[in-house]
């Protein structure tokens, strides 16, 4: 879960704002590749090249996927069901 204390978030805010600002200037066709590059580069820099750490990194990516779906996609889908009706 990405729930870190508010005080710990402050150290990331400025750099994240700058990164998001740069990504928002890209065309939709380029965002995915550049975001993939950024995340891959971060993971390669912080995790040593050992199976244990590769496994941890893949686990982090899986949890990011699940959290994004739970917090963003699922509420969106729920609203669309209300708007258009269920299948």
Short names for language-model regions:
Residues 1-87:
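Solvent-exposed interaction surfaces and binding hotspots enriched for charged
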């Amino acid at each position: 879960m990405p729930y870190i204390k508010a005080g710990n978030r402050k150290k990331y805010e400025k750099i994240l704002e700058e990164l998001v600002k740069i990504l928002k200037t890209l065309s939709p066709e380029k965002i995915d590749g550049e975001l993939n590059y950024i995340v891959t580069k971060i993971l390669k820099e912080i995790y040593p090249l050992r199976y244990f750490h590769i496994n941890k990194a893949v686990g982090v990516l899986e949890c990011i996927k699940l959290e994004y779906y739970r917090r963003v996609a699922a509420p969106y889908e729920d609203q669309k069901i209300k708007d258009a009706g269920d299948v």
